[in-house]
Swiss-Prot record:
Keywords: Membrane, Mitochondrion, Mitochondrion inner membrane, Repeat, Transmembrane, Transmembrane helix, Transport. One of its GO terms (cellular component) is mitochondrial inner membrane. This is Mitochondrial glutathione transporter SLC25A40. PROSITE patterns: SOLCAR. Solcar repeats lie at residues 13-131, 139-223, 233-327. Probable mitochondrial transporter required for glutathione import into mitochondria. Glutathione, which plays key roles in oxidative metabolism, is produced exclusively in the cytosol and is imported in many organelles. Mitochondrial glutathione is required for the activity and stability of proteins containing iron-sulfur clusters, as well as erythropoiesis. The chain crosses the membrane at residues 19-39, 103-123, 145-165, 199-220, 239-259, 298-318. The gene is SLC25A40. Its main location: mitochondrion. It is found in: Mitochondrion inner membrane. Coiled coil: none annotated.
Length: 338
């Protein structure tokens, strides 16, 4: 067989370069997606003001964060009065009255968790994919599923205790000494496993999402390349594949997202009010209760807002990440020539 027909030789990218590419993608994604969630939260707070101690979910496009209302007045960014008539009106009034930076309110503290989680996730996925392909062959279709599951498990396991600490620090201003005492007391009373109390509901949604996302992304990318007669995907092929695969995974896993949100919120109520945790209901039981109360459609509450958030986030993240890797591949290829 003519070696030319097999496409160009693949130039490897180092783990450090993968980390840099994923970090860049994570920051760009959060900068582009966060304004939509900020506006959504401001509209929610306008219609149903958040009381002190109330928690709400804040998304920067990379991961969801449980945030707790701290102050009674209008000092917090999500409590500022706006008199918005809708989404577009909220965008315009926030920019005009508060400055464009207000569209990224609350972002910096969440990036401390979201960027490392994304870097771990994407770098582990690529490293695992390369390892599995070297063992099982390039065309093994199960590789993206396995690599996606393991990478997501690893990222959530590393970040989950840190996110618990971040939420606690945000709900009450702790010094580092007080935080150390809080963690020590929690571990002595409930064991080390208590630091991963939010792990299960997150895994419930993120692992199936990751498996479906990476499998469909790789399949779509290959199909679009074949249709275009290309060996390597373009920026738009990566962008389109990311948006479509992310949208599909978002729809299928939405019931788990609804359950995750409910479990996270209940967990925070018990933690913050020092109420002893009752025997937790299983995911299946919570789903049955939702269906009994709101019908089958209750499992798909928030579908449109989730798609509006997930599709562009997945598209921007993966296309930026692949662009970064492509840039480093060219740099590495040039070094090999000289």
């Amino acid at each position: 067989m003519d070696p030319e027909s097999e496409g160009p030789a693949v130039i490897t990218v180092t783990p450090l370069q993968q980390m840099f590419a994923s970090c860049t993608g994570a920051i760009l994604t959060s900068l582009m997606v966060t304004p939509f969630d900020v506006v959504k939260i401001r509209l929610q707070a306008q219609n149903n003001p958040f009381p002190k101690g109330k928690c709400f979910l804040y998304s920067n496009g990379l991961m969801d964060h449980l945030c707790v209302c701290e102050e009674e007045g209008n000092k917090a960014w999500y409590k500022k009065p706006g008199h918005f008539q809708g989404t577009l009106d909220a965008f315009l009034k926030i920019i005009r009255n508060e400055g464009i930076k207000s569209l990224w309110s609350g972002l910096p503290p969440t990036l401390v968790m979201a960027v490392p989680a994304t870097v771990i996730y994407f770098t582990c996925y690529d490293q695992l994919t390369a390892l599995l392909r070297s063992k099982l062959g390039e065309n093994e279709s199960r590789i993206p599923i396995v690599a996606g599951i393991v990478a997501r498990l690893g990222a959530v396991t590393v970040i989950s205790p840190l996110e618990l600490i971040r939420t606690k620090m945000q709900s009450k201003k702790f010094s580092y000494e007080e935080l150390h005492r809080f963690v020590s007391k929690k571990v002595s009373e409930d064991g080390w496993i208590s630091l991963w109390r939010g792990w299960a509901p997150t895994i419930l949604r993120d692992v199936p999402f990751s498996a479906m996302y990476w499998y469909n992304y790789e399949v779509l990318k290959k199909w679009l390349c074949a249709k275009s007669g290309l060996y390597e995907p373009t920026f738009m092929i990566n962008f389109t594949s990311g948006a479509l695969s992310g949208s599909f995974a978002a729809v299928v896993t939405l019931p788990f997202d609804v359950v995750k949100t409910q479990k996270q919120t209940q967990l925070w109520i018990y933690e913050s009010q020092k109420i002893s945790m009752p025997l937790q209901m299983s995911t299946w039981t919570i789903m049955k209760n939702i269906v009994a109360k709101n019908g089958f459609s209750g499992l798909f509450t928030g579908l449109i807002p989730r798609l509006i958030k997930i599709a562009p986030a997945c598209a921007v993240m993966i296309s930026t990440y692949e662009f970064g890797k492509s840039f480093f591949q060219k740099q590495n290829a040039q070094r090999q020539r000289y």
